[in-house]
Amino acid sequence: MKIVQLSDVHFGAQFRDDVFNQVIDEVNELSPDAVIITGDLTNEGLKEEYEGCKELISKLNVKKIIAMPGNHDYRNTGYLHFKKYFPFQAINELGNGVVVVTIGTARPDRDDGEVGYRQTLWLERTMKKYENKVTILAMHHHLIGIPDTGSDKLTIVDAGDVLRATLDSKVNLVLCGHKHRPWMWDFSNLLIANAGTTSSKRVRGFFENSYNIITVENGKIQVDLKVVGGKRTPLQDITKNYARFEDD
């Protein structure tokens, strides 16, 4: 099973059209089973941004595209447009024993994220149904703070409750975006993978536009960082010794 995670596309003022066209070519060549887009498909939540982004996303030759809104998609009441252009299901059984569950963290007129009591309870009850499968939880906002990103006021405000529910539910992998900073936290039985920005001009530090490639084989999960037009590297290598990538 092969899954691609795109994040923080930011179609609009920050968008790099040439980079995303390269992403389309690379993903189509990779031919994944699914593409997960963890939020901020647009920059300001405007209708014309949704239309332009939809046109580009439709060039991905994949059977399953799972998209969820980010805080930028909620701007200017853009959440009213989201499901029209990017309809999605919260529970996605991909086959081969892999299930992807999405939760919403974006809220109107807020840059921070929140899951809420009811959605957290739903998450726990839902994951119990799939405890014998490989479970992937996808959201926009980062669940845990990420190094080199300054103030961490924009994490999920109820992150402690969500993390507890995630661990109790034996989720195998959490996919996040939001911070434009690739990173991975490894809690032995739980991996939390943060994607960088796929196509925004607002990259952090020495990082480039990138996306993640997730491989699930025999119940084991591997997450690789793929620089657009560049190399593919295990995401865990960056967390272990990311200074090495700066030297490159």
Residue ranges of model-derived segments:
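Conserved beta-sheet core of the metallophosphoesterase superfamily
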Residues: S151-Q222
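Active-site environment of divalent metal-dependent phosphoester hydrolases
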Residues: G12-F15, N43-E48, N71-Y79, P108-D111, ...
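Active-site neighborhood of phospho(di)ester-bond hydrolases with catalytic His/Asp-centered motifs
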Residues: L6-S7, V35-D40, K64-N71, G104, ...
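Extended active-site neighborhood of metal-dependent phosphoesterases/phosphodiesterases
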Residues: K47-K129, D161-L167, I213
